[in-house]
Amino acid sequence: MADEDLIFCLEGVDGGRCSRAGHNADSDTDSDDDEGYFICPITDDHMSNQNVSSKVQSYYSNLTKTECGSTGSPASSFHFKEAWKHAIEKAKHMPDPWAEFHLEDIATEHATRHRYNAVTGEWLKDEVLIKMASQPFGRGAMRECFRTKKLSNFLHAQQWKGASNYVAKRYIEPVDRSVYFEDVQLQMEAKLWGEDYNRHKPPKQVDIMQMCIIELKDRPGQPLFHLEHYIEGKYIKYNSNSGFVRDDNIRLTPQAFSHFTFERSGHQLIVVDIQGVGDLYTDPQIHTEKGTDFGDGNLGVRGMALFFYSHACNRICQSMGLTPFDLSPREQDAVNQSTRLLQSAKTILRGTEEKCGSPRIRTLSSSRPPLLLRLSENSGDENMSDVTFDSLPSSPSSATPHSQKLDHLHWPVFGDLDNMGPRDHDRMDNHRDSENSGDSGYPSEKRSDLDDPEPREHGHSNGNRRHESDEDSLGSSGRVCVETWNLLNPSRLHLPRPSAVALEVQRLNALDLGRKIGKSVLGKVHLAMVRYHEGGRFCEKDEEWDRESAIFHLEHAADLGELEAIVGLGLMYSQLPHHILADVSLKETEENKTKGFDYLLKAAEAGDRHSMILVARAFDTGLNLSPDRCQDWSEALHWYNTALETTDCDEGGEYDGIQDEPQYALLAREAEMLLTGGFGLDKNPQRSGDLYTQAAEAAMEAMKGRLANQYYEKAEEAWAQMEE
């Protein structure tokens, strides 16, 4: 059988059968990579071919109706078909940018390919054939890149001139092998968020390159390489994991995408370090709340703070219902300069963008909850975990294999698309567009924050090469019914959250205090902004750091339930020593005294022992008490008792093991108050004597024998008053 008979036969967009006349094997090979084509099985069975043809015609009939609308005119339908045909013909005649390097003459190597499915969390291995250049053509801060060709597993003959162009990347300095696998997991998790962004119908869709690992088992040590397609065009870094944005590279879509991931995930993560060609991105970084996933590039809430310090909400953010992050007036002035630069951006809104958090397009992952559910398991708010989002099938039949898995696990699956309305089909088409990724060939270091990208080698992607995006990474498959998931797992539901403090405060106010303190990631982001200001990160070396902005974010963090911020503001406003913003002092006014005591009282209610003692002393002595309150020994006794009983963690998850006052001193003060009475507290000599005895025992344990004897004497005096 001739080689060209072994190539997949395709059906064109007009439903006609493909003809081999006038087409060589390379042409046929090219066609089956276009995502608008249906791949048919190789068979000589005439009846089977007829069945396949009818399926293809039915599929493309539905596809055309979806794209053009059920009420669209035949003229618009014809225009859609012609556009696809024109794009395919153009792709076929693109030259190979690496032809001059004659990679086909290099020795063939056997490699084990590791592919990651971000939906199921599974790794699969298979064998591939590659040809890799011996010298790198690009070098970044941490990795170097090698030109590579990989033979498609779909081919039955080794046609290396028709093989796809790839880029193999390896770390310059030796790293643990697990780092390679973490990088792939990160990029494929980020790809899911790109697909979710596309389902909200933005003006321009985004896609993140698919990446896998190849293990060259015939080389010494069996080294690992990352493998990506070669990207066509100019490589640009739009933002980094430290929030850096080049003025001449400001675009709307990359910044809006990062902002979207923060709100859509309920503040549990943000995808940053956006770089690539156009809106085809590679080497992103994900910052998570805990900061423990995905290696050293994950800066946690600090990375989120860095992004929002330099982020100016644009018209895409507004059209998708994303809320601006709260900045101080001085910070806002700096961001407004970027806002003026955004006016030159050419992106035009269609007016059909979906609002972030639209329940109609929320989907769930299949067999194993992916990144977002793993993050939710570690989040402080057990009852407010987030819904995860699965990508749609990348082809009409791609849901089938995983559907069997899901049925096995009793997950409700849309095995077919019967329940999909016209708008759902639109999303499937949008997803198909987003999956049409190119080939990456540029070194991109997500861990080198502020370095400008080095000059890159440019070139056209090889149009007549198989993209093989379906085999280089395991895409998403299967969609789970959200309503059923909510019924089975109501505690896992987590709606998207806005970036605005006022709206987050409204959500927290509906919770009791025990679930309010330390449960807002947005509060942690504002607290990180405080630390960056205090550390001088946001100012020039010779400038004073912005104290007003630091206090602004500290107050917002306190409003959002961050215990450290609440305590810090309470001490600061009360003119007491404080560890956060230690160089900042505020005016001593009645208003500030009231604010300070209110913050300390809130911290005491949240379980902070130091604040309990300060509040008790204020009610006891009247010092540092707010002007609108008066001495109240019953309140003081309550807080002294609470401080004595506090031996577990506070609401912020911390335990203060360094006692501000020893236990015997607090017990003795309680006994003294009960012995004399006053300020709303009745005398109780018997209780006073008991407390003096407890104070004496505590003093003995602390090796304070002389003080213990004094307490025993006072206990006898108190009991003597009781007998009188």
UniProtKB/Swiss-Prot annotation:
Its EC number is 2.7.11.20. The modification Phosphothreonine is found at residues 347, 352. Residues 358-376 have a biased composition (Low complexity). Ubiquitously expressed. Particularly abundant in skeletal muscle and heart. The keyword Nucleotide-binding applies. It comes from the Eukaryota. One of its GO terms (molecular function) is calcium ion binding. Autophosphorylated at multiple residues, Thr-347 being the major site. Phosphorylated by AMP-activated protein kinase AMPK at Ser-397 leading to EEF2K activation and protein synthesis inhibition. Phosphorylated by TRPM7 at Ser-77 resulting in improved protein stability, higher EE2F phosphorylated and subsequently reduced rate of protein synthesis. Phosphorylation by other kinases such as CDK1 and MAPK13 at Ser-358 or RPS6KA1 and RPS6KB1 at Ser-365 instead decrease EEF2K activity and promote protein synthesis. Residues 385-403 have a biased composition (Polar residues). Residues 353-476 are annotated as: Disordered. The modification Phosphoserine is found at residues 27, 61, 70, 73, 77, 242, 358, 365, 391, 397, 434, 444, 469, 473, 476, 499. It catalyses: [translation elongation factor 2] + ATP = [translation elongation factor 2]-phosphate + ADP + H(+). Gene3D superfamilies: MHCK/EF2 kinase (3.20.200.10), Phosphorylase Kinase, domain 1 (3.30.200.20), Tetratricopeptide repeat domain (1.25.40.10). Residues 421-435, 444-469 have a biased composition (Basic and acidic residues). Undergoes calcium/calmodulin-dependent intramolecular autophosphorylation, and this results in it becoming partially calcium/calmodulin-independent. Keywords: Acetylation, ATP-binding, Calcium, Calmodulin-binding, Kinase, Nucleotide-binding, Phosphoprotein, Serine/threonine-protein kinase, Transferase. ATP binds at residues 295-301. One of its GO terms (biological process) is cellular response to brain-derived neurotrophic factor stimulus. GO terms for cellular component: dendritic spine; glutamatergic synapse; postsynaptic density. Residues 115-325 form the Alpha-type protein kinase domain. The modification N-acetylalanine is found at residue 2. Belongs to the protein kinase superfamily. Alpha-type protein kinase family. Monomer or homodimer. Interacts with Calmodulin/CALM1; this interaction is strictly required for phosphorylation activity. Threonine kinase that regulates protein synthesis by controlling the rate of peptide chain elongation. Upon activation by a variety of upstream kinases including AMPK or TRPM7, phosphorylates the elongation factor EEF2 at a single site, renders it unable to bind ribosomes and thus inactive. In turn, the rate of protein synthesis is reduced. This is Eukaryotic elongation factor 2 kinase. It comes from Mus musculus.
